[in-house]
């Protein structure tokens, strides 16, 4: 099935690209999420009339992501206290939601889906360098310091 992308989709294409995808992917994900429309003549004409508006919206999203990246750079690091044993092993773990919550409390609005933990949840006390994926084209590094609170 051919679709016209209404925004940039990772590993697929950018705004306005006409791409061939599996029918289920288009019907169950891209179209319901508003990321694409099926490539019919009517939709192509409608897309061409809205292209400038969609490009402006995409540019605004990138601008917001860049401002957020600058705010993260100004912040530098975030400290998350967690209960830990004497060896530095945490009771539980620090996950993406905990990191997003700590960043939001520090003044930078981040969703948990934007925090990527390549090696899984943090289970030890220490400093970790993470990358926050704010937009498909904008990533921001952040240092997360997990401190232990002994019981």
Swiss-Prot record:
UniProt-listed GO biological process terms: translation
SUPFAM superfamilies: L9 N-domain-like, Ribosomal protein L9 C-domain
Keywords: Ribonucleoprotein, Ribosomal protein, RNA-binding, rRNA-binding
Signal peptide: none
GO molecular function, one term: rRNA binding
GO cellular component, one term: ribonucleoprotein complex
NCBIfam families documented for this protein: L9
Annotated family: Belongs to the bacterial ribosomal protein bL9 family.
Function, as annotated: Binds to the 23S rRNA.
Protein name: Large ribosomal subunit protein bL9
């Amino acid at each position: 099935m051919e679709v016209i992308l209404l925004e940039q989709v990772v590993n697929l294409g950018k705004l306005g690209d006409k791409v061939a995808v599996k029918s289920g992917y288009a019907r169950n994900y891209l179209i319901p999420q508003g990321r694409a429309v099926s490539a019919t003549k009517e939709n192509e004409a409608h897309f061409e009339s809205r292209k400038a508006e969609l490009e402006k919206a995409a540019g605004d999203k990138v601008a917001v992501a860049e401002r957020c990246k600058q705010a993260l750079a100004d912040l530098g690091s975030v400290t998350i206290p967690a209960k830990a044993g004497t060896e530095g092993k945490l009771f539980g773990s620090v996950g993406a939601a905990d990191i997003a919550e700590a960043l939001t409390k520090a003044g930078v609005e981040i969703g948990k889906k934007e925090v990527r933990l390549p090696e899984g949840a943090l289970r030890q006390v220490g400093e970790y360098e993470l990358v926050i994926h704010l937009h498909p084209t904008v990533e921001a590094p952040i240092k997360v310091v997990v401190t232990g609170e002994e019981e």
